[in-house]
Amino acid sequence: MKYSIASMKVTLFFYFLCAKNIASLKYTKSNLSFLYNGCDNINSGGVNAHRNKTTVQTKNKHSKLKILSLNEKQDEELHYELNPENTEKVLNLIRPKLQIDNGDVELVDIKGNDLYIRLLGNCITCSSNSVTVSQVIKKTLKMYIRGPGNKEPNVIIINFDEINEENILNCLSDLKPYFDFLKIKLVIKEMINNKENINNSVMLVFKNIENEDKEVNIPHNIKTEITGRLKQNFPTLTVNFEN
Protein backbone atom coordinates (compact mmCIF):
# COMPACT_ATOMS: atom_id res chain seq x y z
CA MET A 1 0.00 0.00 0.00
CA LYS A 2 2.75 2.39 0.96
CA TYR A 3 4.56 1.45 -2.22
CA SER A 4 1.49 2.35 -4.34
CA ILE A 5 1.06 5.73 -2.66
CA ALA A 6 4.74 6.54 -3.20
CA SER A 7 4.46 5.60 -6.88
CA MET A 8 1.43 7.89 -7.33
CA LYS A 9 3.31 10.81 -5.72
CA VAL A 10 6.28 10.35 -8.02
CA THR A 11 3.96 10.15 -11.06
CA LEU A 12 2.11 13.34 -10.06
CA PHE A 13 5.44 15.13 -9.45
CA PHE A 14 6.71 14.33 -12.95
CA TYR A 15 3.34 15.28 -14.46
CA PHE A 16 3.39 18.79 -12.95
CA LEU A 17 7.06 19.21 -13.84
CA CYS A 18 6.43 18.33 -17.51
CA ALA A 19 3.35 20.57 -17.64
CA LYS A 20 5.38 23.49 -16.28
CA ASN A 21 8.19 22.93 -18.81
CA ILE A 22 5.71 22.75 -21.68
CA ALA A 23 4.14 26.04 -20.61
CA SER A 24 7.60 27.58 -20.34
CA LEU A 25 8.50 26.38 -23.83
CA LYS A 26 5.31 27.84 -25.28
CA TYR A 27 6.07 31.19 -23.66
CA THR A 28 9.63 31.12 -24.92
CA LYS A 29 8.51 30.22 -28.43
CA SER A 30 6.01 33.06 -28.33
CA ASN A 31 8.71 35.47 -27.25
CA LEU A 32 11.06 34.23 -29.93
CA SER A 33 8.34 34.61 -32.54
CA PHE A 34 7.69 38.15 -31.37
CA LEU A 35 11.36 39.03 -31.40
CA TYR A 36 11.82 37.51 -34.87
CA ASN A 37 8.84 39.35 -36.29
CA GLY A 38 9.94 42.56 -34.61
CA CYS A 39 13.44 42.29 -36.06
CA ASP A 40 11.98 41.51 -39.46
CA ASN A 41 9.79 44.59 -39.27
CA ILE A 42 12.75 46.73 -38.22
CA ASN A 43 14.89 45.36 -41.04
CA SER A 44 12.09 45.88 -43.53
CA GLY A 45 11.66 49.42 -42.29
CA GLY A 46 15.40 50.04 -42.63
CA VAL A 47 15.45 48.63 -46.16
CA ASN A 48 12.41 50.69 -47.14
CA ALA A 49 13.96 53.82 -45.64
CA HIS A 50 17.20 53.14 -47.52
CA ARG A 51 15.26 52.60 -50.75
CA ASN A 52 13.35 55.84 -50.24
CA LYS A 53 16.59 57.71 -49.56
CA THR A 54 18.21 56.25 -52.66
CA THR A 55 15.17 57.20 -54.74
CA VAL A 56 15.32 60.80 -53.48
CA GLN A 57 19.06 60.99 -54.19
CA THR A 58 18.53 59.61 -57.69
CA LYS A 59 15.78 62.13 -58.36
CA ASN A 60 18.01 64.96 -57.13
CA LYS A 61 20.85 63.69 -59.32
CA HIS A 62 18.63 63.59 -62.39
CA SER A 63 17.32 67.03 -61.54
CA LYS A 64 20.86 68.46 -61.36
CA LEU A 65 21.77 66.81 -64.65
CA LYS A 66 18.72 68.34 -66.31
CA ILE A 67 19.64 71.79 -64.99
CA LEU A 68 23.24 71.46 -66.15
CA SER A 69 22.16 70.25 -69.58
CA LEU A 70 19.72 73.13 -69.86
CA ASN A 71 22.39 75.68 -68.96
CA GLU A 72 24.83 74.19 -71.48
CA LYS A 73 22.15 74.29 -74.14
CA GLN A 74 21.42 77.94 -73.37
CA ASP A 75 25.13 78.82 -73.62
CA GLU A 76 25.41 77.05 -76.97
CA GLU A 77 22.46 79.01 -78.34
CA LEU A 78 23.99 82.38 -77.34
CA HIS A 79 25.56 83.37 -80.66
CA TYR A 80 26.26 86.71 -82.32
CA GLU A 81 26.34 87.47 -86.02
CA LEU A 82 29.81 87.78 -87.53
CA ASN A 83 30.34 91.53 -87.96
CA PRO A 84 32.81 94.14 -86.62
CA GLU A 85 30.52 95.38 -83.83
CA ASN A 86 29.81 91.93 -82.38
CA THR A 87 33.44 90.87 -82.75
CA GLU A 88 34.54 93.90 -80.72
CA LYS A 89 32.01 92.99 -78.02
CA VAL A 90 33.51 89.53 -77.68
CA LEU A 91 37.09 90.85 -77.77
CA ASN A 92 36.18 93.23 -74.94
CA LEU A 93 35.64 90.15 -72.78
CA ILE A 94 39.30 89.24 -73.29
CA ARG A 95 40.99 92.66 -73.33
CA PRO A 96 41.04 93.41 -69.57
CA LYS A 97 43.21 90.37 -68.80
CA LEU A 98 45.56 91.14 -71.69
CA GLN A 99 45.93 94.79 -70.70
CA ILE A 100 47.05 93.81 -67.20
CA ASP A 101 50.24 92.46 -68.83
CA ASN A 102 50.48 95.40 -71.26
CA GLY A 103 49.02 93.41 -74.11
CA ASP A 104 46.00 93.89 -76.35
CA VAL A 105 44.16 92.50 -79.35
CA GLU A 106 42.57 94.18 -82.35
CA LEU A 107 40.24 93.27 -85.19
CA VAL A 108 42.00 93.63 -88.54
CA ASP A 109 39.46 92.46 -91.12
CA ILE A 110 36.52 90.18 -91.86
CA LYS A 111 36.36 88.35 -95.20
CA GLY A 112 33.47 85.95 -95.57
CA ASN A 113 33.84 83.53 -92.69
CA ASP A 114 37.49 84.47 -92.06
CA LEU A 115 38.15 86.63 -89.02
CA TYR A 116 41.58 88.32 -88.94
CA ILE A 117 42.93 89.23 -85.50
CA ARG A 118 46.22 90.85 -84.46
CA LEU A 119 47.94 90.55 -81.08
CA LEU A 120 49.61 93.66 -79.67
CA GLY A 121 52.17 94.55 -77.00
CA ASN A 122 53.46 91.85 -74.67
CA CYS A 123 51.13 89.31 -76.26
CA ILE A 124 53.72 88.78 -78.98
CA THR A 125 57.02 89.27 -77.15
CA CYS A 126 56.72 86.00 -75.23
CA SER A 127 56.27 83.07 -77.60
CA SER A 128 54.86 80.64 -75.01
CA ASN A 129 52.38 83.22 -73.74
CA SER A 130 51.36 84.24 -77.25
CA VAL A 131 50.40 80.66 -78.12
CA THR A 132 48.17 80.44 -75.04
CA VAL A 133 46.59 83.83 -75.74
CA SER A 134 45.95 82.87 -79.36
CA GLN A 135 44.18 79.69 -78.29
CA VAL A 136 41.98 81.57 -75.79
CA ILE A 137 41.04 84.22 -78.37
CA LYS A 138 40.15 81.62 -81.00
CA LYS A 139 38.12 79.53 -78.55
CA THR A 140 36.19 82.56 -77.25
CA LEU A 141 35.37 83.94 -80.70
CA LYS A 142 34.24 80.52 -81.95
CA MET A 143 32.09 80.11 -78.86
CA TYR A 144 30.07 83.31 -79.36
CA ILE A 145 30.32 84.24 -83.06
CA ARG A 146 28.62 82.57 -86.00
CA GLY A 147 29.30 83.37 -89.64
CA PRO A 148 27.28 82.67 -92.80
CA GLY A 149 25.35 79.41 -92.59
CA ASN A 150 25.63 79.46 -88.78
CA LYS A 151 29.24 78.26 -89.05
CA GLU A 152 32.04 78.91 -86.59
CA PRO A 153 34.36 81.64 -87.88
CA ASN A 154 37.81 80.78 -89.14
CA VAL A 155 39.89 82.85 -86.71
CA ILE A 156 43.28 83.85 -88.08
CA ILE A 157 45.87 85.42 -85.76
CA ILE A 158 47.92 87.24 -88.38
CA ASN A 159 50.97 87.53 -86.09
CA PHE A 160 51.39 83.77 -86.25
CA ASP A 161 48.95 82.07 -88.59
CA GLU A 162 50.03 83.87 -91.77
CA ILE A 163 53.04 82.17 -93.28
CA ASN A 164 55.62 84.83 -94.03
CA GLU A 165 59.29 85.45 -93.28
CA GLU A 166 58.64 87.78 -90.36
CA ASN A 167 56.30 85.39 -88.55
CA ILE A 168 58.58 82.41 -89.09
CA LEU A 169 61.58 84.24 -87.62
CA ASN A 170 59.47 85.57 -84.72
CA CYS A 171 58.38 82.02 -83.96
CA LEU A 172 62.05 81.03 -83.57
CA SER A 173 63.19 84.17 -81.74
CA ASP A 174 63.66 82.28 -78.45
CA LEU A 175 66.43 80.25 -80.09
CA LYS A 176 68.44 83.29 -81.18
CA PRO A 177 70.66 83.38 -78.03
CA TYR A 178 71.65 79.78 -78.73
CA PHE A 179 72.45 80.62 -82.36
CA ASP A 180 74.49 83.64 -81.26
CA PHE A 181 76.49 81.44 -78.89
CA LEU A 182 77.32 79.10 -81.79
CA LYS A 183 78.05 82.12 -83.99
CA ILE A 184 75.50 81.06 -86.59
CA LYS A 185 72.36 82.54 -88.04
CA LEU A 186 69.23 81.00 -89.53
CA VAL A 187 68.30 82.16 -93.00
CA ILE A 188 65.12 81.50 -94.99
CA LYS A 189 66.40 80.47 -98.39
CA GLU A 190 63.06 79.65 -99.99
CA MET A 191 59.39 79.79 -98.99
CA ILE A 192 56.21 78.62 -100.71
CA ASN A 193 52.93 79.97 -99.35
CA ASN A 194 49.64 79.04 -101.01
CA LYS A 195 46.39 80.79 -100.15
CA GLU A 196 44.68 77.39 -100.09
CA ASN A 197 47.04 76.43 -97.22
CA ILE A 198 48.27 73.33 -99.04
CA ASN A 199 51.84 72.44 -100.02
CA ASN A 200 53.25 75.28 -97.93
CA SER A 201 56.97 74.84 -97.33
CA VAL A 202 60.08 76.64 -96.17
CA MET A 203 63.75 75.90 -96.83
CA LEU A 204 66.07 76.91 -93.98
CA VAL A 205 69.84 77.19 -94.07
CA PHE A 206 72.36 77.78 -91.27
CA LYS A 207 75.27 80.10 -91.94
CA ASN A 208 78.35 81.03 -89.98
CA ILE A 209 78.23 84.66 -88.89
CA GLU A 210 81.96 85.27 -89.38
CA ASN A 211 82.36 83.25 -92.56
CA GLU A 212 79.24 82.37 -94.55
CA ASP A 213 81.19 79.98 -96.76
CA LYS A 214 82.25 77.89 -93.80
CA GLU A 215 80.39 74.60 -93.41
CA VAL A 216 77.97 74.49 -90.48
CA ASN A 217 76.84 71.31 -88.76
CA ILE A 218 73.73 71.58 -86.59
CA PRO A 219 72.68 68.78 -84.17
CA HIS A 220 69.60 66.83 -85.20
CA ASN A 221 67.76 67.67 -81.97
CA ILE A 222 68.00 71.40 -82.77
CA LYS A 223 66.43 70.83 -86.17
CA THR A 224 63.69 68.78 -84.49
CA GLU A 225 63.03 71.64 -82.06
CA ILE A 226 62.81 74.17 -84.91
CA THR A 227 60.45 71.95 -86.88
CA GLY A 228 58.23 71.39 -83.83
CA ARG A 229 57.90 75.10 -83.09
CA LEU A 230 57.06 75.98 -86.67
CA LYS A 231 54.54 73.15 -87.03
CA GLN A 232 52.83 74.28 -83.84
CA ASN A 233 52.19 77.74 -85.29
CA PHE A 234 51.88 76.72 -88.93
CA PRO A 235 50.34 73.22 -89.09
CA THR A 236 50.32 73.16 -92.91
CA LEU A 237 53.99 74.13 -93.22
CA THR A 238 56.60 71.61 -94.36
CA VAL A 239 60.03 72.44 -92.92
CA ASN A 240 63.19 71.53 -94.84
CA PHE A 241 66.88 72.14 -94.09
CA GLU A 242 69.63 72.65 -96.65
CA ASN A 243 72.42 71.78 -94.22
From Swiss-Prot:
Entry function: Binds and transfers [4Fe-4S] iron-sulfur clusters to target proteins.
A GO molecular-function descriptor: iron ion binding
SUPFAM superfamilies: Fe-S cluster assembly (FSCA) domain-like (SSF117916)
Entry annotated with the keyword rRNA processing: no
Record note on disruption phenotype: Disruption affects formation of merosomes, merozoite-filled vesicles budding from mature liver stage parasites. No significant effect on life cycle progression. No significant effect on the numbers of liver stage parasites. No significant effect on infectivity in mosquito and number of mosquito midgut- and salivary gland-associated sporozoites. No significant effect on the initiation of a blood stage infection. Non-significant delay in blood stage expansion.
TM spans (from-to): none
Source organism phylogeny: Eukaryota, Sar, Alveolata, Apicomplexa, Aconoidasida
InterPro entries from the UniProt entry: FSCA_dom_sf, NIF_FeS_clus_asmbl_NifU_C
Family label: Belongs to the NifU family.
Pathway: Cofactor biosynthesis; iron-sulfur cluster biosynthesis
Cellular component per GO, a single term: apicoplast
Protein name: NifU-like scaffold protein
Organism the protein comes from: Plasmodium berghei (strain Anka)
Pfam families membership: NifU (PF01106)
Keywords: 4Fe-4S, Apicoplast, Iron, Iron-sulfur, Metal-binding, Plastid
GO biological process annotation, one example: iron-sulfur cluster assembly
Localization (cell): Plastid, Apicoplast
Quaternary assembly: Homodimer.
Broad class of where this protein is predominantly found: plastid
